[in-house]
Amino acid sequence: MKKISEDIKQIARRVFKLGWPVTIQQVLNTLMRTVDVVVTSLFSPAAVAAVGLADLYAQIPLRIGLGLGIGSIALSSQDTGRGAVTARDRVVTQAVLIGALCGIPFVVIGLVFSNALIQLLGAESEVVRLGGLYLMIVFAAAPLRIVGLVGARSLQGTGDTRTPMIINGIANVINIVLTVSLGLGIWLAPNLGIVGVGVGTFVGRTVEALLFVGLFASSRGPLSFQQPRSFVITKQLLSVSGPNFLEGMSTSLANFPFNALLLIFGTEANAAYHIGRRIFQQVTSPISRSFAVVTSIITGQTLGEGRPEAVRQDVRKIFIISLSVLSAVSLLLFVISSPLVSLFSEDPTTREYAVTFTRVFSLSAISFGAFFPLAGALQGAGDTRTPFYARLLGVTVCMLGVSYVLSITLGFGLTGIYIGIISTHVSWVFVAVLGIKYGNWVGNAEAMISKRKQESENK
């Protein structure tokens, strides 16, 4: 028993060392987004709607970057574990190139079709005008955004989580300063309104991408650019990244019919859902996603070292730590939900609904504590299909299916929605546990590593 306790303490120290910079990075990203929303809300309702609609399309390059980032962290952590520096450098080189190439079409689409894309969603003329301008600028930054995400994840795979935090922090501070100054026209800056918010995003993403590329090109960090000539790496990057992209898009697309379902119960119920979700994300996302990233790093590196049994033990220990932390967060969020909601709305009906939604989400924090380390372990091994299946099952069968049947068909109203939300996240855990227990994720990772090793030896 004492040995188990010491083992958990040892892995907990490693998790904290790797995880706190990731948590800070996530907090800064959330803060940047919150500032954008607050500044935009000072313009007009049309501006808020314009940014909201444009962000629906901006999810696509974001998901591409996150997908390639998952591929990068899996391969770079595995190659770090086996000491294959050249192969690891080829991973980041090819991931950055693929990311930049994937982002270029969005620049063209933004220049030509930005207004049409906003109009396609049925927006009014002023919303189309503002949303088109904002989307054009955001899409212009797509290659840079993707490169920044890939660069951060690649470095994290080596075990360096502080440098991405610093670079991302610099970019976010620049973004926030420009958003406030150019958006509101304070200090000596011109008042550009919504264009200023877009320019802040563009400049911030540009700085982030240039800092990562400059770091890799200088060879001063753990990663550097190598001649991109490995077809095996390209194939593995795409095979790992693809399901993660689909995972993110399935969740984003499911939000459209789910919001339509919520609107049946009134604007207040819909607004309350978004308030509860925003509070939940602000409080839990930095922590849960940190556990996912850290588990990916440890899993990939340990598999690269050729210690598959140690991987399973580490995952179990991180699972216990994550579940304990998020359970405590769940309890805290449940207790303080009412005062938190009061910061977002003064309407009594909206506040009443929002408190309930926040408490429902707080219960889901327990599922997040279980799911994210399991998903991180699978992703670190290169298995992104199982987390994709988990999310797809959750959003289609539970988030949409269960919610609709219980709330509309059986007439339970919002109670059916609450059950649908909780069951969604429980289903994620169910599928992830099956994947960890019965899937061949360790064997598949060893096969991927072996193929990269053979290719290196043949050259």
Feature annotation, model-predicted:
Residues 17-37, 137, 148, 201-208, ...:
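Transmembrane helical elements of multi-pass membrane transporters/channels
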Residues 99, 153-181, 195, 202, ...:
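Alpha-helical transmembrane segments of multi-pass membrane transporters/permeases
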Residues 31-34, 42-45, 79-82, 157-158, ...:
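Helix-loop interface residues and adjacent transmembrane-helix termini in multi-pass membrane transporters
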Residues 123-134, 138, 142-170:
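Cytoplasmic helix-loop-helix junction between adjacent transmembrane helices
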Residues 23, 27, 60, 64, ...:
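Residue-level signature of the transmembrane alpha-helical core
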Residues 35, 39-59, 125-130, 194-195, ...:
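Interfacial/gating helices of multi-pass transporter permease domains
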Residues 48-108, 145-157, 164, 272-335, ...:
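Small-residue-rich hydrophobic transmembrane alpha-helices
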Residues 1-19, 76-141, 191-241, 299-364, ...:
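Short alpha-helical transmembrane segments in multi-pass integral membrane proteins
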